[in-house]
Amino acid sequence: MSRVGRKPIVVPAGVTLTLNGTELTVKGPKGQLVRSFHEDIKINIAENEVIVERPSDNKLHRSLHGTTRALVSNMVTGVSEGFTRTLELVGVGYRAAKSGNGVTLSLGFSHPVEVTPEEGIEIDVPNQTTLVVKGINKERVGQIAAEIRSLRKPEPYKGKGIKYSNEVVRRKEGKKGK
């Protein structure tokens, strides 16, 4: 039995779950998320908890069990608390500025880079070298943060680039002189 899949999901106050066939709708104070799941996996909604069950121990059902439980848990957390990813810009002249709905990044290119988030995702700029990506969908928040990071990945010699706030950039020693 999946150790992740066995755990019940505690539903906080103010969050409602609706199961329509294989489609689960989660509504909360921050918004609403809808997702379809595999028809073999059963999602039981009780008063303040959700239990995910599988019909058999075959390989497909075992793999779907923990995955489904994690996805439902992320949906519940997203609509109640939301998710954030913090990025830091390291390097001389690397800065970010809020522009309308999106962000303008100066990353050492000959042109500024415009990043416009999709609906449901918000990018804050607390200071010139920090970006905070916020949203209710964990996958989309992580994906947009990864796309921003990929514009200028941290390099190993000086550490310049865009990195996650908790990321440790492995440093290399430069060439040896004579």
From Swiss-Prot:
It comes from Brevibacillus brevis (strain 47 / JCM 6285 / NBRC 100599). One of its GO terms (biological process) is cytoplasmic translation. GO terms for cellular component: cytosolic large ribosomal subunit. This is Large ribosomal subunit protein uL6. Coiled coil: none annotated. Disulfide bonds: none annotated. This protein binds to the 23S rRNA, and is important in its secondary structure. It is located near the subunit interface in the base of the L7/L12 stalk, and near the tRNA binding site of the peptidyltransferase center. Keywords: Ribonucleoprotein, Ribosomal protein, RNA-binding, rRNA-binding. It holds the Pfam family Ribosomal_L6. Part of the 50S ribosomal subunit.
